[in-house]
């Protein structure tokens, strides 16, 4: 749906409801600002001719638009209704802004010209120079000469003519058609007038008057005169009054202002529509983020419930195991008590002795069977405990995997524990029960059937898990191949100045070496010494016979760390300081983690902002957003 469709959905009755969103945005000054540089303005009419308002003017403007005619869109009305509420509730005490300085119109000659005072336009000046016998006629007819002579009036063009009937040289200087040209032409006339050589003196001169140059502005009588001067003026110019030119300029300016005002109004309307669409999109995005947060919270709660259920199941198994162990101990005590009673009796006859021996033999056999059953039970218990611990560890490692694999793994673990429990119970039943006891045989058969069902179910789960693990390994292989291709493609393109880039893991940082050498040597010697020292330690890092590591911790928690007591490291720290020592130590840790067998630096995708290995998702996101900006900066 485009913006026009969204506007059409806002009815007159919904204007009050839709004004709430721009009202909150005005209060927070997130998108709209009413106060700009200490002045009040309408944020929804940016670009209008009137920008600065007094408080009452702006309030009247907002109220008028919100209750305007049908030509106003519902979006405009809702926005200006929000502005009116904002002024009433939040800016009621705002001081009146300083008035803008008035625009001073250009100073013009306020004296209206007489009807006969009509000028030639574009503005022109006339200079006539009677020719004396001593004058150089060819020089006076040179336009370049007159252009230099009249240069202080800045004419754009000068033309010289020979007027045969008056034996004079006529010069016409053309000026700019704007008011600066008019000022230059009148300045030329005033210059000759102060010298007593204007048009009036030229027309009133006597025959034997002094031969000198005369000058004035070209007017209607000059335009209508005969001769080369009149012909040139009628060809190159027209007759205009100052008021006509001023009126035409005002009309042109007003026309231009109207066109620009309409363009600004249309642009403001489009801007308001785009702003409204942006606000709706921002609100939709916020709802999506809230839903995502709720889903994440629900997933965390579900995971917690599953962990609690697994813990209760393990506790039940341990309780049943303890119960079986107590029952075995009780039966062993009963047998021992019976054996002691049998030993006290003396056989009076051989038959009784034989019977007593037979009872002892059976008692010993039963005792051995019980001991064997106890050992089997103990083994089963230990197996169950180990299995519980192993499953618990696997479960903690698999919490970050997909939920389907987690449920299947929990089911498999439960089946394995039940199978181990059934095996333990069967071993106990075999050693305790009598082969002729039908109830025992029936119970053992049921347990065997249940055990077979559990094994079959376990095999199905293992088959499914095997398929999933195969897919996971394939995915891991593809991910590693993708990482290598990204490393090859981004190497040299990105560096530590960007958030995501390629880092050489295990590469020695040369800066600490250069810093410490600058403190001991001159500038040139420091570079040489730093390069030599750094090269030496790069070779030491590549030496596989040097293993400055030790193991800390026990069992699965043991890890390799740098041995601070290594002689070479201790010597390096004494001679070159802690910073150089830490640089070598950091390179050792990275090399031991990423390429312990090869002992040479390797490339890795790195998140420089957080100081850790970057995920493929982070790299892809960075490429899609920041690489374009980076390329534009480089071009």
Curated annotation (Swiss-Prot):
GO terms for biological process: gene silencing by siRNA-directed DNA methylation; regulation of double-strand break repair via homologous recombination. Highly expressed in flowers and at lower levels in roots, leaves and stems. Residues 350-365 have a biased composition (Basic and acidic residues). It comes from the Eukaryota. Gene3D superfamilies: XS domain. Transmembrane segments: none annotated. InterPro entries: FDM1-5/IDN2, FDM1-5/IDN2_XH, XS_domain, XS_domain_sf, Znf-XS_domain. The keyword Coiled coil applies. Keywords: Coiled coil, RNA-mediated gene silencing. Disruption phenotype: No visible phenotype under normal growth conditions. The double mutants idnl1-1 and idnl2-1 show a late-flowering phenotype and reduced level of DNA methylation. The double mutants fdm1-1 and fdm2-1 show reduced level of DNA methylation and repeat-associated small interfering RNAs (ra-siRNAs). Residues 289-471 form a coiled coil. Residues 350-376 are annotated as: Disordered. Forms a complex with IDN2 and FMD1/INDL1. Forms a complex with IDN2 and FDM1/IDNL1 that is required for RNA-directed DNA methylation (RdDM) and that functions at a downstream step of the RdDM pathway. This is Factor of DNA methylation 2.
């Amino acid at each position: 749906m485009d913006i026009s469709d969204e506007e059409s959905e806002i009815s007159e009755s919904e204007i009050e409801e839709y004004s709430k969103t721009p009202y909150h945005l005005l209060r927070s000054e997130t998108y709209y600002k009413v106060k700009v540089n200490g002045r009040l303005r309408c944020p929804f009419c940016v670009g209008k001719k009137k920008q600065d308002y007094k408080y009452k003017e702006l309030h009247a403007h907002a109220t008028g638009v919100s209750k305007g005619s049908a030509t106003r869109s519902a979006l405009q009305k809702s926005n200006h209704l929000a502005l009116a509420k904002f002024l009433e509730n939040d800016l009621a005490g705002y001081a009146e802004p300083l008035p803008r300085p008035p625009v001073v119109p250009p100073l013009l000659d306020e004296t209206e010209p007489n009807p006969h005072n009509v000028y030639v336009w574009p503005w022109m000046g006339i200079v006539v120079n009677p020719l004396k016998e001593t004058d150089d006629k060819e020089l006076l007819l040179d336009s370049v000469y007159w252009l230099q002579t009249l240069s202080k009036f800045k004419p754009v063009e000068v033309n010289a003519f020979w007027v045969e009937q008056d034996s004079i040289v006529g010069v016409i200087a053309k000026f700019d058609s704007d008011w600066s040209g008019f000022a230059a032409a009148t300045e030329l006339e005033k210059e000759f007038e102060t010298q007593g050589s204007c048009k009036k003196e030229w027309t009133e001169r006597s025959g034997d008057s002094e031969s000198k140059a005369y000058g004035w502005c070209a007017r209607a009588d000059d335009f209508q005169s005969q001769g080369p001067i009149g012909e040139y003026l009628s060809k190159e110019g027209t007759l205009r009054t100052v008021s006509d030119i001023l009126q035409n300029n005002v009309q042109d300016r007003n026309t231009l202002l109207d066109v620009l005002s309409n363009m600004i109004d249309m642009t403001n309307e489009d801007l308001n529509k785009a702003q409204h669409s942006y606000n709706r999109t921002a609100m939709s995005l916020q709802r999506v983020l809230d839903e995502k947060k709720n889903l994440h919270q629900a997933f965390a709660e579900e995971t917690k419930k599953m962990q609690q259920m697994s813990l209760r199941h393990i506790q039940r198994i341990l309780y049943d195991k303890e119960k079986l162990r107590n029952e075995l101990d009780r039966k062993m005590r009963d047998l021992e008590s019976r054996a002691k009673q049998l030993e006290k009796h003396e056989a009076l006859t051989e038959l009784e002795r034989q019977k007593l021996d037979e009872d002892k033999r059976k008692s010993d056999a039963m005792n051995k069977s019980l001991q064997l059953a106890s050992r089997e039970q103990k083994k089963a218990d230990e197996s169950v405990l180990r299995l519980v611990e192993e499953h618990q560890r696997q479960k903690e490692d698999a919490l970050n995997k997909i939920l389907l694999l987690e449920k299947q793994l929990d089911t498999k673990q439960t089946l394995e524990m039940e199978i181990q429990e059934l095996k333990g119970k069967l071993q106990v039943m075999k050693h305790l029960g009598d082969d002729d006891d039908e109830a025992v045989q029936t119970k053992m058969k049921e347990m065997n059937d249940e055990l077979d069902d559990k094994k079959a179910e376990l095999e199905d789960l293992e088959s499914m898990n095997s398929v999933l693990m195969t897919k996971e390994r394939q995915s891991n292989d593809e991910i590693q191949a993708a990482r290598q291709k990204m490393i090859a493609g981004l190497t040299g393109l990105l560096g530590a100045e960007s958030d995501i880039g390629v880092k050489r893991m295990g590469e020695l940082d040369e800066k600490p070496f250069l810093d410490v050498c600058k403190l001991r040597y001159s500038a040139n010697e420091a570079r040489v010494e730093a390069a030599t020292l750094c090269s030496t330690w790069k070779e030491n890092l590549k030496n596989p016979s040097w293993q400055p590591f030790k193991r800390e911790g026990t069992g699965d928690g043991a890890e390799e760390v740098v041995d601070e007591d290594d002689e070479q490291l201790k010597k390096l720290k004494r001679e070159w300081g802690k910073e150089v020592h830490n640089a070598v130590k950091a390179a050792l840790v990275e090399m031991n983690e990423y390429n312990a067998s090869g002992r040479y630096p390797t490339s890795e995708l790195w998140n420089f902002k957080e100081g850790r290995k970057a995920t493929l998702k982070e790299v892809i996101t960075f490429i899609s957003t920041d690489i374009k900006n980076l390329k534009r900066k480089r071009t």
